[in-house]
Amino acid sequence: MTVSAIKIIEPGEIQGLPDKDMPQLVVPSPKHLFAERASRLEYLAKDGELKGWLEFCAMLAKAQSEVIDKVSVASVDDSLITGSLKNHIPPLSISTWKVNEEWSTVYQKFTEQLAANKLPQKATESIAAFSKLSPDDQAKQVIAFLNADEASVRPEYAPFIGAALQLIWTKRAEQLAAYTEFYKGESSLCPVCGSHPIASVVRTGDRDANRFMACSLCASEWYGPRARCTNCETPIEVSILGESQEDSVQGECCDECHGYLKLMLQSKDPMMEVMADDLATIGLDIALSNEGFQRTGRNMYFLSGGEQETKTS
């Protein structure tokens, strides 16, 4: 891949404040989310060197879509939601969550659905190996991955842990649909759960030309000013790196912290799905790494492979 750097204009010039009627926080509809993700992954897997990898990821998303209606989570108190959002505290913070029966039930339902869909042998062996761990060791793996302590996580367990955690958090985040208007502000971490973004996306429709951060865990999206580093929040403009200006997925790269987050332009590919298109553009990650930049976004289907300076909620 040929990577070229294109400097963008100052943050204040590229975009001012969002329109007052534009939603600044959007929470997911899990059933549609996972079905669309599976469909997009199946489409992206048709050709190219990543065919096998994307087919496996499509199986994960398909199982998520098939099991999501069987997932039940505890309800969240109304006053906790409104109070937290008003005070810029994630109401579903990962920092206070513990591995519990809810997790065990969701993980079991998810992996049983995967087994019914005829997983590759290596994936089946990884699930079996995880099941042989003691409950304490399982919990350590889950909590480490949830909190982005990726060095402590076995890579073969990551896709299954991550997918099950997404089932829980998207279902929990769905409960906030009636309260999103209480969120006003800016955040580099998800205002719903406190997780890292997977990428930023410039949407069309009622959020036309505005940049939103997409959560890697709960799939909520929140407004973020363009041309600003989402990792260190320096006022210095970021660079856009990619094969060409016409690419629908590029890298927002910061010369201060040397981190990058993918930028996805829905206007260039209306069918894009943030997590799926992140998985399909691993070549861009490799190219940006070769340019000296470190990935700051997360994808719950794999480990990023580098030490990430992790913000906490």
Regions found by a protein language model. Name each.
Residues M1-L80, L263-S313:
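Long, contiguous alpha-helical scaffold regions
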Residues T2, T82, T96, T105, ...:
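Residue-identity detector for threonine
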Residues S131-D136, P155-A163, C193-V201, N290-T310:
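Short N-terminal helix-initiation segments at or just after the protein's N-terminus
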Residues A173-G292:
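Cys/His-clustered metal-coordination modules, chiefly Zn-binding fingers
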